[in-house]
Amino acid sequence: MEAATEFVVESPDVVYSPETIEAQYEYRTTSVSREGGVLKVHPTSTRFTFRTARQVPRLGVMLVGWGGNNGSTLTAAVLANRLRLSWPTRTGRKEANYYGSLTQAGTVSLGLDAEGKEVFVPFSSLLPMVAPDDLVFDGWDISSLNLAEAMRRAQVLDWGLQEQLWPHMEAMRPRPSVYIPEFIAANQSARADNVIPGTRAQQLEQIRRDIRDFRFSAGLDKVIVLWTANTERFCEVIPGLNDTAENLLRTIQLGLEVSPSTLFAVASILEGCAFLNGSPQNTLVPGALELAWQRRVFVGGDDFKSGQTKVKSVLVDFLIGSGLKTMSIVSYNHLGNNDGQNLSAPPQFRSKEVSKSSVVDDMVHSNPVLYSPGEQPDHCVVIKYVPYVGDSKRALDEYTSELMLGGTNTLVLHNTCEDSLLAAPIMLDLALLTELCQRVSFCTDVDPDPQSFHPVLSLLGFLFKAPLAPPGSPVVNALFRQRSCIENILRACVGLPPQNHMLLEHKMERPGLKRVGPLATTSPVLCKKGSAPTAPNGCTGDANGHSQAEAPQMPTT
């Protein structure tokens, strides 16, 4: 069925006003206790009131690494869609779209219509969201190339599209950025001709001035800052240096070790702007997280989940969920863009290796039948730099699992990932969903004071390889669980129950739900002794496309 564009929930629990959507929602879950070796499961229920502001702001996005492949590609994508561009290719004419974006190209099911068919709507229609074509971009880069030149250097887009975008992008020039050579590979020094001078404290203040200038000059209501620059080496968490907000701010003032990405995170938080980390390093050290908590500013990370790791988070979930014991995961990549060149240095590769390797942890821990405590699959990650392949990353994976009675199963997968074309829609979703979360507040029957989501915005886990979560919160990596989390929270905001995929209406011998349509019965089917009527629920008796001579007779009690 073709996706509709808008809907209204007709329920006494949902109230629409010009300013807000207010929904009463019953959150049902379970708590588990252990008593004498027996697990006691206790169903619980909490009454939530969600309130979502309907007024969509004028939103600006500042990209750290704006002139890189990801930044130039995202900017080009929004411009191409805004201008409704099309261009010729060897396989025919292509038109601008937002394929790869959960919010712009995904759909959700609202339920069944009168004929028992599912009704789907665009994901973006669940709640009022900023239109991506309306986004305003700015940012920083250690390279001084304008965005048109950066787009050409990236070699991601077809030439015909580049030619049309050139006059719209050549006036866009990144602001100077922070360059600390020891945090990125030495091979990046050739690009570093556009840097902020001075001490760490002076650099922090310059970033803050840049954010304020962008907000004022572009007439923006909100700004979100997103790190899409080089992968940095890990920063050691040291008591007295970066373990608390106070210590981190003092470290910056004293000019001690702090990474460029952490400087941008601190500046964003101090300016009240959400900060999202799209690279694998530990940008959000404990001091930065504490500062975000103190200022009630959203932060999220780490590392865009775009290609090989997204497939891994599905495939391992499938294998373990099917009862197969995955024992070996070997992942090999080669790519030729600047990300690959930077990752050719061991300290930067180590950051990426950590984020890629942790993606299966929650799936392994979810099955104590297969894995004993502390047991993990062997997991090897290799990344090589091959300049010729450019942004077209090759990913090869081998998954080996144990079967029953000593058997083994091996899956080998080759995946060609257009790196920036996969990352750009993720960056778009991060900005749109983060802004939406800023307009949602809620209270509960036991805590009537309005509150927002936790500053560590774990709802964004679907979009990150190594998702951050609040202290003590479980980390979820399984892709479909992550997507369901986003969808069901947005459904709750309009008073809809979570999507459970049960479809009980279609699994009953005698449907008790009244429907209108050609397959509906005119009167309820009565339960009597003896054989049940043939196909009382409208079943045709067809199985896998093959008609049956006679529908099965179901016994009754």
From Swiss-Prot:
Reactions catalysed: D-glucose 6-phosphate = 1D-myo-inositol 3-phosphate
Pfam families: Inos-1-P_synth, NAD_binding_5
Phosphoserine found at: S279, S357, S523
Cofactor(s) required, per the database record: NAD(+)
Tissues in which the protein is found: Expressed in testis (at protein level).
Residues the record lists as binding NAD(+): 67-70, 141, 177-178, 188, 191, 228-231, 278-279, 303, 306, 337-339, 352, 390-391, 419-420
Alphabetical list of Gene3D superfamilies matching this protein: NAD(P)-binding Rossmann-like Domain
Segments for region (Disordered): 527-557
Identification of the protein by name: Inositol-3-phosphate synthase 1
UniProt source species: Bos taurus (Bovine)
